[in-house]
Amino acid sequence: MTDASGSERLKRAKGISEGTPSSLPDHLIRATAAEGKIRVVGLVATQAVQEARERHKLSYVATVALGRAMSAALLLAANLKRRQARINLQLKGNGPLGNIWVDAGLDGTVRGYVSNPAIELPLTAESKLDVGQAVGRYGYLHVLRDLGYGQPYTSAVELVSGEVGDDITYYLSSSEQIPSAVLLGVNLDSQRVRAAGGVLLQLMPGAPASLIPEMEARLAKVEEFSPMLACGGGLRELLQLCLGDLDLKIAPEMRTIRFYCKCNSDRVKGALRMLGRDELLDMIHTDKGAEAVCQFCNEVYRISEDELRSIVAEMSATP
């Protein structure tokens, strides 16, 4: 943003507010409702989204878009079976934000980035951040499921709105053929993310289709759930508000959520080896070293000239 008036308008936007940020730890919980006919997953990912915002220097609208995608990927990953299983989301729309990439695991780890993190757009007529316009109304949502064994499973659907939640709901109903209702939210102020998270309701096999509009209506009751989290409301309390009179049973287990990237200097050095001896020698003579930036976490790795020479020596010694 380039002027104070623009900043003030953004502060007044729905989803942006000033005040004390939520101190709730990032976590995921599971539950059932309607006598076990509805599967429920809810999560808080405030610190994870804040770390993504800081690492990538995200604008307001980029923070909300990536935060929604991170929460969505974590919700989908929660239904995987093996601890090493992971979900990859790619939203490739025609908007100025470019592409969104997110990687999340059953273990609660998540990372992600956007192509154009600094982009900002005018607010909508309802004074909301225009995530759909930033992502784009036309394009595709790609979902890769790595189950931890065999070949990963990939599917794609057209974007419905670019708002992320609608697109995930459409993917689940059309590709996975699971009637679902998804609620995603990010609440932030000029300093930090105050609350972020999501709720996923899914019909269990054999459940009556009449429960589908019921699920949608229940989530509509807590449409502004991220501001509620930001004001100190707990995730369990929010689920009680949404489903408390529908035989809600919350599992006692709670899974920790955190931003985590598996990049490290050894991986960077391994990637440099792939460039070949001649390319590395050119780096030594021209650049006196090498620099690499991880796209997912924006971590900068600097490989010294001596380290490059060691890599070349190892390559030369290998038959």
Swiss-Prot record:
UniProt PTM comment: Under oxidizing conditions two disulfide bonds are formed involving the reactive cysteines. Under reducing conditions zinc is bound to the reactive cysteines and the protein is inactive.
Keywords per UniProt: Chaperone, Cytoplasm, Disulfide bond, Redox-active center, Zinc
S-S bridge residues: 261-263, 294-297
Keyword Disulfide bond appears in the UniProt entry: yes
Major location category of this protein: cytoplasm
GO molecular-function term, one example from the UniProt record: unfolded protein binding
Compartments, record wording: Cytoplasm
Gene Ontology BP annotations: protein refolding
This protein's GO CC annotations: cytoplasm
Pfam entry (one): HSP33
Nucleus listed as a keyword: no
Cross-referenced InterPro entries: Heat_shock_Hsp33 (IPR000397), Heat_shock_Hsp33_C (IPR016154), Heat_shock_Hsp33_N (IPR016153)
Domain of life where this protein originates: Bacteria
Signal peptide range in chain numbering: none
Region annotated Disordered, chain positions: 1-25
Ranges of compositional bias, category Basic and acidic residues: 1-10
PANTHER family documented for this protein: 33 KDA CHAPERONIN
Its job: Redox regulated molecular chaperone. Protects both thermally unfolding and oxidatively damaged proteins from irreversible aggregation. Plays an important role in the bacterial defense system toward oxidative stress.
Stated family: Belongs to the HSP33 family.
UniProt protein name: 33 kDa chaperonin
Organism, scientific name: Synechococcus sp. (strain JA-2-3B'a(2-13))
